[in-house]
């Protein structure tokens, strides 16, 4: 009898440790009501409502629409491991993230409400390793993040012909005639460094455009992180940053089939930051099959942290027209800045385990009709106090296929800086090159 009681108690304890089966919750801004049951037939209206009622491992399916956050605050906070899947038609009969656009697009007039989160999507699980969730897999899929209408831009300075805005302004500077508040200056997706949890995170089929700070800033405690099949266009400082917040552990992460263009420097002097991807200490990175181009400083930055405490596989990527270099790393006592044709010298250096199959862009015509031509021309023409650092021959090759005027030498003075990019045109970057960069979402 005693053995049976002990066995029953053990089964009960085990049942408490097992995750409950995931529930599907549905949200439709145009057809839902917050008093509904949150089913496909009776969806909630607001995403914040679905997040509030969701339990660990639930999946929230989000129909097309621009979701403003509670009281139009412009952000959402996840304190439980919940998945967000966007790109559905209003009746959930179809899913196509490029056709049925699920958007997080905050507005400047609500920047006074931004203090509740450091990102448009802020993930912060329990801070106690004992209480934090385990064994989960969070997925963020098919959402468009655009912080361009929460930012403030100069009325005239750094405004090339045909542009909607001048250069991006960092607070407290602002365009007082057009905006109520300074730029939000926040991450698009942020996971808090104090967050704990043992599980996996996947970010896929998303678009990150006009980010006012890092696009993806992941601090992960335990588990795996995957950044797959996303478009990053016109973000500040860093597009993809994954770090380990567990001082005694390591995480594995993958960055694959992303298209990463126009990552801007920290300030408008173009002096520092402006990286597409960075690997950090206590991280093992597998970076492959991406398109990495037109970034202000470098494509891949490997200068952060002790190189003996991280590893990187950097294989089969397309690099093109990154302003200073394609890879930047520490080769003591200096910083090495290397173009793709010099990658063979880097294997075994600075934690690089593999660096094979990377190529320079051979056919610039693949971007015809996909990159905004005015934006590209202004970017290629940038010149500050120093001579341009871009290869004029490669610049003209790209100009030629886009029908832009060629330049014998690049002398045009243009002090543009993170001007707002037409967000809808960023979606054209999906499917540009078979097997490389972001493919059409499935």
Language-model features: locations:
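N-terminal extracellular ligand-recognition/capping segment immediately after the signal peptide
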Residues: 48, 56-94
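Positively charged n-region of N-terminal signal peptides that target proteins for export
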Residues: 1-6
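Acidic, glycine- and Ser/Thr-rich low-complexity intrinsically disordered tracts
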Residues: 93-103, 107-109, 172, 179, ...
